[in-house]
């Protein structure tokens, strides 16, 4: 069983607006609404791959109700902690004429200490049947930057392998907690190691640097490829993989 954790779950709304211009009134030609947040997206992908998965995290208000109902409709097993504040809504605006994407993200709900404690208790319970726990996405307001790190350390002691996909300070301190895998994108990895990448060698150096911070395995993603460092017993492997183009 894989458990995905989404602290900042959202309702994702995508609007298609051809020839969009700021300061003008437009009518969307299409709209799509779905439950979102990185951890939920991971759970959705695992479900489609027929991998046993349960999604957990924080959900509040009517937006939280909508998130949970959407997951139930998709037959994604879930067990979220209900919180008093409203979960966020994220809006993406697609202009197919210009080939442009604009995104607007809310900060997310305020979370009470007792709500976080309830989530940690739930993780302890779910870890009994979990092989992996995936922590993905940003943290809501008032949640300490070391939340992921402390949760990872606790689960490591319980023999559960943890995956971390976040950014900024939560990523930096989370890597030091020695997760099984950390998966930043290029921008997040550049921020973590303090330099920009311009050629393949920069990515390979960054893999080692991030592993030295504490991560057992590292995957740096780009739009069409990724660079990885994986340890298997006494073997250390580095690779680059290209993603094939898939027609919708």
Locate each region found by the language model.
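Glycine-rich phosphate/adenosyl-contacting loop at the front of the ribokinase-like
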Residues: 1-56, 65-66, 237-246
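Hydrophobic anchor at the start of a short beta-strand
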Residues: 2, 51-53, 78, 162, ...
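Short beta-strand segments
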Residues: 4-7, 57, 82-83, 92-94, ...
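Small-residue (G/A/S/T)-rich helix-start motifs and N-terminal tracts that mark the onset
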Residues: 24, 32, 52, 73, ...
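Conserved N-terminal subdomain of the carbohydrate kinase-like
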Residues: 24, 48-130
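Short beta-strand scaffold segments in enzyme catalytic cores
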Residues: 44, 91-93, 226-230
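Short acidic, glycine-rich surface-loop motifs adjacent to enzyme active sites
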Residues: 129-142
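Conserved phosphate/ATP/ADP-binding segment of small-molecule kinases
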Residues: 145-233
């Amino acid at each position: 069983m894989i458990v995905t954790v989404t602290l900042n779950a959202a309702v994702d709304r995508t609007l298609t607006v051809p020839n969009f211009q700021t300061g003008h009134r437009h009518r969307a030609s299409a709209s799509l609404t779905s439950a979102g947040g990185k951890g939920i997206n991971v759970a959705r992908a695992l479900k489609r791959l027929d991998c046993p998965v349960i999604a957990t995290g924080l959900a509040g208000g009517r937006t939280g109700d909508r998130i949970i109902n959407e997951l139930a409709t998709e037959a994604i097993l879930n067990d979220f902690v209900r919180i008093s504040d409203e979960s966020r809504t994220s809006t993406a605006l697609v202009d197919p004429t210009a080939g442009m994407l604009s995104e607007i993200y809310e900060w997310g709900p305020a979370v009470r200490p007792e709500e976080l404690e309830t989530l940690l208790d739930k993780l302890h319970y779910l870890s009994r049947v979990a092989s992996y726990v995936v922590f993905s996405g940003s943290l809501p307001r008032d949640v300490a930057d070391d939340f992921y790190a402390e949760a990872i350390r606790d689960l490591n002691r319980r023999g559960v392998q943890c995956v971390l996909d976040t950014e900024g300070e939560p990523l930096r301190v989370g890597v030091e907690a020695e997760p099984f895998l950390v998966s930043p994108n290029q921008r997040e990895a550049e921020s973590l190691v303090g330099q920009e990448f311009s050629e393949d060698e920069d990515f390979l150096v960054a893999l080692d640097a991030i592993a030295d911070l504490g991560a057992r395995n590292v995957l740096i993603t780009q739009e069409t490829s990724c660079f990885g460092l994986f340890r298997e017993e006494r073997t250390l492997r580095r690779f680059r993989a290209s993603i094939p183009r898939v027609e919708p």
